[in-house]
Amino acid sequence: MRATPSSSPQPFKGLVVIELGHSVAAPFAGHILSELGAEVIKIEKSDGDDARRWGPPFWEGASAFFQALNRNKSSVVCNFRDPHESQALQRLILERADVVLQNLRPGHVEKLGLDGPTLLAQKPSLVYCNLGAFGRTGPLKDRPGYDPLMQAFGGVMSTTGEPGRPSVRVGASIVDMGTGLWSVVGILTALYERVQTGRGRVVDVSLFETATSWTSLLAAQYLCTGESPQKQGSGASGIAPYKAYITLDGEVVVAAGSDSLFRSLAQVVGHPEWIDDPRFVDNPSRVRNQVELYRMLDDLMAQRATRDWVNDLEAAGIPCSPVQSIAQMAEHPQTQALGLIQPVPDTGMRFVSLPLSLDGQRPVSQGRPPTLGEHTDSIDRKSTRLNSSHIPLSRMPS
């Protein structure tokens, strides 16, 4: 059954998250928590999160990037340079927050008195998550960073692309989004512990640490042999045949990663003699002779259409897939059957939902992305009711 905003699972309902976040990593973490029911209050500088301007394309007043990451959040504007407003923000955190997320530039929250140790000293139950660039310690801890820099520094780019050609960034922001995901893992760990102890924690994650985690299997090869893995194109180090091929009308990926699957592949491509060929008799042999094996498979695959290959390979039980565009993925019946792309209430927007379901229901957005400072006044008034010595946060110009 498809979930609607009223029936969508909201296991984090009642959890209040203050997001001092910009760009991708912290907003993606806030997005996950928001889609699962948390109230996420996004604190923005006076001209807003820079991601609002990351376009084109723009959709209903902000970039598609921003809208995808910030739906169902409140937006509050704060002039961090004004000490009165920083104090008001601190009070908002102490009064309402269960969780604080922050990925501001290194040292900024400490100057504002909004760092984890300062806030936990006043509110021990708070869970505070730092999303940094290089990590909480070490010679580079104070440097800023972004996804492509960390794909480069963390070794991801060095193993991505075709052999003999320049390194390539993975198209998706895997380091930014992975860091957001790891921050949620850390936050949930701390919240689970808080149920038992009543105390929060400071959680530290970073883009660099996330990048190293994505390369952990490749790093295992280096740690075992002392040799850095090389680029494999669409293939995988240590497994053959296991890559994409150009067909008559597109591309197809074939993953014949075991001896039995290779025997089946040899039959499908019309070369049963490969089964007993000493060069290809087992995976280590195929890896040693993969240049010749791939040359022959490349020639064969180019002779037929993608759909013909997929039909024959699937009939033989060989894992394979056409290389789909984003448009093909979005419109595929499997995507639609899973309800992976959902409309956003009160907008014409559609976005990819969280890749999980609870009791068969996928969490869906409860509200649209906020305009800049849209909720400053309403949250300001709520804080005023809580504290008679309230100093207001910024007002948006009319």
Describe each PLM feature range.
Residues 240-316, 320:
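Aromatic-enriched alpha-helical interface/lid elements that frame and gate functional surfaces
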Residues 315-366:
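A glycine-rich dinucleotide-binding beta-alpha-beta segment and adjacent secondary-structure elements
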Residues 180-200, 213, 217-225, 266-273:
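Oxidoreductase and adenylate-handling cofactor-binding alpha/beta cores
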Residues 382, 386-398:
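Single conserved hydrophobic/aromatic residue that forms the stacking wall/gate
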Residues 1-196, 371, 375-385:
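N-terminal helix-loop segment corresponding to the beta1-alpha1 unit
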Residues 2-3, 281, 345-385:
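Flexible, small-/acidic-enriched active-site or ligand-binding loops
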Residues 136, 164-172, 195-211, 230-237, ...:
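Conserved Rossmann-fold dehydrogenase catalytic segment
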Residues 47, 134-135, 207-212, 249-251, ...:
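Glycine-rich beta-alpha junction loops
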